[in-house]
């Protein structure tokens, strides 16, 4: 057997070993100690394929929620520790993994929160949101997680990206987008889009949230041609002043 044959066989053996460990790790019916051993062994392997195998654990839920949380925490800690290896691009592998996922991204995002700085996380969330449309999705979990995380990442670039989701067909996404935009508080950017959303919105909690924001910003005036529409949707505790601003009625 030549050297190249030996190296090829060694590489194939490693691939088979990682596949076997991944199969154990993602089998929710084996004993927890077996899955823990698989996590430890994959961590020690320290290869890109081992990182991908560990990420697969985030895709399944163990029947016991305590065990499930403990194992996912262990995987999270293992991935963070593996990132210390300068020859192992844990960040890049997880980022590519997230690009192809439509659900269960919370734990991989949690790992990246430890590995990326603030601006890098903003750029990542912006990139991932760009691939999310505002149309109907059977499972909007990824979009919802990203919009939710956006609230804690104040950035005009991210606020601009979030504006699309004011028109999302999913009410929860619209509500979270409003919350995030108000938390970012780029007033000149959000005033007109929020006013338009207020005119069209049917969800009471979203109308309430936007009306509260307008009442807190009396400099946000409603154009005369839009006042009739706005008055028609305002909850009873709000009113529209003749000067065009929304205010809260006194009890």
Give the residues covered by each predicted segment:
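Structural detector for internal amphipathic alpha-helices that build alpha-solenoid repeat scaffolds
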Residues: 2-13, 33-47, 66-85, 103-118, ...
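Amphipathic alpha-helical scaffolding segments comprising HEAT/armadillo-like alpha-solenoid repeats
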Residues: 11-26, 47-63, 84-98, 118-133, ...
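Detector for Asparagine
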Residues: 27, 61-64, 96, 106, ...
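Charged, low-complexity interaction regions
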Residues: 29-31
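Terminal, low-structured helical/coil segments at or just beyond the last alpha-helical repeat
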Residues: 225-251
């Amino acid at each position: 057997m030549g050297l190249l044959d030996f190296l090829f066989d060694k590489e194939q053996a490693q691939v088979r070993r990682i596949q076997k460990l991944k199969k154990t790790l993602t089998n929710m019916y084996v004993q927890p100690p077996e899955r823990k051993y698989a996590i430890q062994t994959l961590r020690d392997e320290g290869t890109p394929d081992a990182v991908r195998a560990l990420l697969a654990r985030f895709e399944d839920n163990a029947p016991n929620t305590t065990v499930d949380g403990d194992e996912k925490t262990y995987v999270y800690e293992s991935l963070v520790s593996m990132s210390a290896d300068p020859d192992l691009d844990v960040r890049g592998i997880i980022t590519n993994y997230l690009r192809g996922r439509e659900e269960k991204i919370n734990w991989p995002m949690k790992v990246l929160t430890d590995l990326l700085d603030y601006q890098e996380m903003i750029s990542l969330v912006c990139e991932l949101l760009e691939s999310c449309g505002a149309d109907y999705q059977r499972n909007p979990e990824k979009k919802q997680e990203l919009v939710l995380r956006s609230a804690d990442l104040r950035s005009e670039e991210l606020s601009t990206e979030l504006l699309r989701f004011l028109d999302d067909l999913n009410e929860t996404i619209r509500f979270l987008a409003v919350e995030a935009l108000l938390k970012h508080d780029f007033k000149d950017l959000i005033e007109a889009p929020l006013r338009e959303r207020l005119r069209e919105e049917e969800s009471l909690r979203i109308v309430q949230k936007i009306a509260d924001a307008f009442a807190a910003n009396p400099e946000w005036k409603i154009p005369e041609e839009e006042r009739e529409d706005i008055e028609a949707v305002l909850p009873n505790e709000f009113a529209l002043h003749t000067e065009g601003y929304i205010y809260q009625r006194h009890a």
